[in-house]
Amino acid sequence: MAKVSMRDMLQAGVHFGHQTRYWNPKMKSYIFGARSKVHIINLEKTVPMFDDAMNFISSVAAKKGKVLFVGTKRAASEAVKDAAGRCDQFYVNHRWLGGMLTNWKTVRQSIKRLKDLETQSQDGTFEKLTKKEALMRTREMDKLEKSLGGIKNMGGLPDVLFVVDADHEHIAIKEANNLGIPVVSIVDTNSNPDGVDYVIPGNDDAIRAVQLYLNAAADTVLEARAQDIVVQAEQDGFVEAE
């Protein structure tokens, strides 16, 4: 699994929390102190908790489990898409539509519509339509792609959520809780850690910090998958023992 050192975290600003007046008292045990009215997160706590979270993601990925990356605010959006794409997993980075998990049946129908429209755009169907109708379908396809593009090939509910901001994505966390899907989340000093199975106390706003978490998670998935392929090959007798 990907290792992230305390030095890496310091350089990325993981230890900078929110202004003290916005704090959530439930995060008290993870706060080292305050500097210039900004809470400082105790990285002595964050590092082992981050390792625990990565271990869990590794165990899910090794069993071919599905990881859903969730980060819909501007600071996280691109990084979430990149990380999920790099490790061939899934993401929501635009807007969390209520019921995305708890109402999967309906979401599945929307995904089917998106795929139908994609096929139509490629097989010449759009060209046979009036300009207005083709434009309307293109707009519908773009809108669906924005919302569902990152989960259109998920093929069912995920096995774990990796959330960038517990406060901003509280609806996603609640849905996962209702369905018994484990949640790994970055939790800043202004957020509520309740409902998060693997809390990672850390800055959820700085782009460098967000990229650090996401890159480590993507690397962890890739390593676990590669390890699984080696094990499978050995079991199948493709790799000779030295």
Swiss-Prot record:
<dbReference type="GO" id="GO:0003735">
    <property type="term" value="F:structural constituent of ribosome"/>
</dbReference>
<dbReference type="GO" id="GO:0006412">
    <property type="term" value="P:translation"/>
</dbReference>
<comment type="similarity">
    <text>Belongs to the universal ribosomal protein uS2 family.</text>
</comment>
<dbReference type="InterPro" id="IPR023591">
    <property type="entry name" value="Ribosomal_uS2_flav_dom_sf"/>
</dbReference>
<dbReference type="InterPro" id="IPR005706">
    <property type="entry name" value="Ribosomal_uS2_bac/mit/plastid"/>
</dbReference>
<dbReference type="InterPro" id="IPR018130">
    <property type="entry name" value="Ribosomal_uS2_CS"/>
</dbReference>
<keyword id="KW-0687">Ribonucleoprotein</keyword>
<keyword id="KW-0689">Ribosomal protein</keyword>
<dbReference type="Pfam" id="PF00318">
    <property type="entry name" value="Ribosomal_S2"/>
</dbReference>
<protein>
    <recommendedName>
        <fullName>Small ribosomal subunit protein uS2</fullName>
    </recommendedName>
</protein>
<dbReference type="InterPro" id="IPR001865">
    <property type="entry name" value="Ribosomal_uS2"/>
</dbReference>
<dbReference type="GO" id="GO:0022627">
    <property type="term" value="C:cytosolic small ribosomal subunit"/>
</dbReference>
